[in-house]
Regions:
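Bacterial Sec-dependent N-terminal signal peptides
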Residues: 1-24
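Accessory carbohydrate-recognition regions in carbohydrate-active enzymes
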Residues: 22-154
Length: 154
């Protein structure tokens, strides 16, 4: 009798466990471009919770709208830096700036008031993809697709 009770309890618990819903992935509902225009001072880069870096494109260098490095209304990218803070309202980006290029480059700045570096590239938002942990864009000047990814720290 006791053995039957234990077996029935085990079967019942196993059956109840198998009826629990699986974990849902809500990342498809995330829009990383929210706050990248106006004065939201956010960026669309490849970010995951507790990640060590926040790689993202930098479209601006100076002034208030350059706080996060990315401003949605811009159409040129100066490079991709690896440290950003989202929504802070102060310049906190631009460390370890990388730019994929092809051919001979001119590395002189365009002038103090210019928002573009000499090696900047035009891009289109139609060729831009941002998802949690992933960012890609096609750089028109160099005909290069740049892809950024991030993972959580171990």
């Amino acid at each position: 009798m006791k053995l039957n009770f234990m077996l029935m309890s085990g079967v019942l618990l196993f059956g109840m466990y198998s009826c629990t819903p699986g974990a849902q992935d809500y990342s498809s509902y995330v829009n990383p471009f929210i706050g990248t225009g106006g004065h939201g001072h956010t960026y669309p880069g490849a970010v995951v919770p507790n990640g060590m870096i926040q790689p993202s494109p930098d479209t601006r260098i100076y002034q208030w709208d350059a706080c996060s490095g990315y401003y949605y209304a811009d159409s040129t990218i100066n490079g991709f830096s690896h440290t950003h803070l989202s929504g802070t309202g102060c310049g906190d980006y631009g460390d370890v700036l990388l730019m994929p290029t092809v051919g001979k480059q001119d590395y002189h700045a365009m002038g103090e008031e210019s928002q573009q570096m000499a090696y900047a590239s035009a891009f289109s938002h139609d060729n831009e993809v941002a998802q949690p942990g992933y960012y890609s864009v096609f750089l028109d000047r160099y005909q290069v697709k740049a892809e950024l990814t991030a993972t959580k720290r171990a």
